[in-house]
Amino acid sequence: MWNPEAYLSFADHRGRPFFDLLARVGADAPRRVVDLGCGPGNLTVVLRHRWPEAVVEAWDNSPEMVAAARERGVQANLGDVRGWSPQPDTDVVLSNATLQWVPEHPELLTRWAGALAAGSWLAMQVPGNFDAPSHQAVRRLADREPWAPLLHDIPFRVGKVVETPADYAALLTDAGCSVDAWETTYIHELTDAHPVLEWITGTALRPVRSRLTDEQWDRFRAELIPLLDEAYPVRADGRTFFPFRRVFVVARTG
C-alpha cells in the first residue's frame, strides 16, 4: 500500500527530477498529456499549468494515490500502466519514477513509441540506485533472523533493474525516435533524524511493510537505523548527504 503522506514528506527532493525531465519536453500545444504513475498528483498539477489547453490524464495503480490526486482536482484513473495505450490525440506521455516497478518496461516504451503519432513526446525518469548502500542495508537485514522467514519471498530488486541511458537511447532510436538520454546523481541534503530511513519508508520499504505487523515493522526499522546511519553518517552540522542516481529519457517520435 502506498502512503501519500510518507511519499510527500520529501516532495521537494523527489520533485526536482520531474522538473529536470519536463524541461526537455518541447511540446508547444499538445492536445492530450498523460502522466503514468501520477502518485498523489502534486506534480500532475504542474502539467496542467504548463499546458492549460490540454486534456491532462493521469494513471496510478494505488487507490490511495488516486484518491489523493483526485483531491487536487486531477483527472486520475486507477489502472496498471501495462494495460495503458495512447489515444489518437495523445501528444505527450510522461512517467516519473514509476517504470522501475515494471520489469518489462523496455517493451512498453517500444510499444508506446510505436502507437504515438509522429511528433509526439515520450519522457520518463527512473531511479538508478538499486545497488546503493540504502538498498544493500535493507537486503542484509532482511536476510537475518527473524526476518528471513517473513521476507524470503519478497523480490528485492538487484542487478539491472533499469537500463543505462545508452541502452534506452538505442532502444527508442531503433523504434524510430530521436532521443535525449542522460543520468544525474543528486546529492540530497537531509536534516531530519534518520532521514534516509524516512526517505526509503515511502518507497523501497513498501514491500517489507506489507509483510509485517505494526510491532514487527517498528522493530525492523529500529534494526535498520544503525545500518543506514553507518552508510550515511550525520555531519557535525546535522546534515546528511544522500546521493541518488536517476536515469532520464526524452524521445520524440518520428
UniProtKB/Swiss-Prot annotation:
InterPro entries: SAM-dependent_MTases_sf, Trans-aconitate_MeTrfase, Trans_acon_MeTrfase_C
Cysteine disulfide links: none
Catalytic activities: trans-aconitate + S-adenosyl-L-methionine = (E)-3-(methoxycarbonyl)pent-2-enedioate + S-adenosyl-L-homocysteine
Top-rank lineage group of the source organism: Bacteria
GO biological process: methylation
Enzyme class: transferase
CC annotations in GO: cytoplasm
Localization in the cell: Cytoplasm
Alphabetical list of Pfam families matching this protein: Methyltransf_23
UniProt keyword annotation of Secreted present: no
Keyword terms, alphabetized: Cytoplasm, Methyltransferase, S-adenosyl-L-methionine, Transferase
GO molecular function, one term: trans-aconitate 2-methyltransferase activity
UniProt-listed Enzyme Commission number(s): 2.1.1.144
Reported function: Catalyzes the S-adenosylmethionine monomethyl esterification of trans-aconitate.
Family assignment from sequence similarity: Belongs to the methyltransferase superfamily. Tam family.
Protein known as: Trans-aconitate 2-methyltransferase
Organism from which the protein derives: Mycobacterium sp. (strain KMS)
Gene field: tam
